Amino acid sequence: MSVQTSQQTVNLQTEFKQTQIQEVLDDLDRELIGLQTVKTRIREIAALLLVDRLRQKLGLSSSNPGLHMSFTGSPGTGKTTVARKMADILYRLGYIKKGHLITVTRDDLVGQYIGHTAPKTKQVLKNAMGGVLFIDEAYYLYRPDNERDYGAEAIEILLQVMENQRDDLVIIFAGYKDKMDRFYTSNPGLASRVANHVNFPDYTPEELLMIGKIMLQEQQYQMTPEAEKVFLQYIQRRMEQPHFANARSVRNALDRARLRQANRIFATPGKKLTKFDLVTIQAEDILKSRLFQ
């Protein structure tokens, strides 16, 4: 077919509406605080895939966009949430048949003795076919300091599937950026098959406070203005501590604050309780954290 003389047309707006990917992108905006660079990158990937679909409809050759991805960033920055939305986008655009997300770590793929790794990895891949396989902390698959480690066998099987069955499965490798960079350097064959790299920045203290307020609202709780100020101080201190995990750490802190609130209420058995009493986190419920002692 001559591209220049073809009179075929395709309506971008109609195709865009039919795929309903705008709903997914809107959900992403609504559910995730901040992360503008991540949202922009996901929109770019979605646009590329939609254009590729339109090209195929007009009989043009597919650009064969690489679908395997790398999500890098600290824990609790929304990588799994975005992976779930990406699976939905890929499904709505027809790149995968089912659209489900399977999340695994090294333990789900690698066996402890000879002959155990291949069946474990193949079973995971079988379960993930037609969807997206999200491998968290993927760098733990590769342990060059241990010659008897079976992670390399799992990587080899993943490579074969990424190359030969890329129409049926998308793999997302995830983890800390520095460790993932070393992982790709050590496994160039794998790195060459990962076309889309998305970096997830850490949240700011103010963004984490907003996330915390949303988490509480979803459980029909609220913080007093004074409690919000104290919780912001808590976040700033907690960010300086080891093992900080962004939104995950915020959720854990709020769970403990609700526990202290319940104990505070329980300590006044004679008091008649209002709805406000039951839904409100006070500053003292946060100040009793060890970070303030």
Curated annotation (Swiss-Prot):
Phenotype when changing residue 238 to A: Reduces ATPase activity 2-fold and activase activity 8-fold
A Pfam family of this chain: AAA_lid_6
Result after altering residue 193 to A: Abolishes ATPase and activase activities
Presence of the UniProt keyword Plastid in the record: yes
GO cellular component: chloroplast
Gene3D superfamilies the UniProt entry points to: 1.10.8.60, P-loop containing nucleotide triphosphate hydrolases (3.40.50.300)
SMART domains the UniProt entry points to: AAA
Role noted for this protein: Required for the expression of ribulose 1,5-bisphosphate carboxylase/oxygenase (RuBisCo). ATPase involved in the activation of red-type RuBisCo, which tends to form inactive complexes with its substrate ribulose 1,5-bisphosphate (RuBP). Catalyzes the release of RuBP from inhibited RuBisCo in an ATP-dependent manner. Activation of RuBisCO involves the ATP-dependent carboxylation of the epsilon-amino group of lysine leading to a carbamate structure. The nuclear-encoded subunit plays a more critical role in activase function than the plastidial-encoded subunit.
Subunit structure: Forms homooligomers. Forms heterohexameric rings with the nuclear-encoded Rca subunit consisting of 3 of each nuclear- and plastidial-encoded subunits that alternate in the ring.
NCBIfam families, A to Z: cbbX_cfxQ (TIGR02880)
Protein name stated in the entry: Ribulose bisphosphate carboxylase/oxygenase activase, chloroplastic
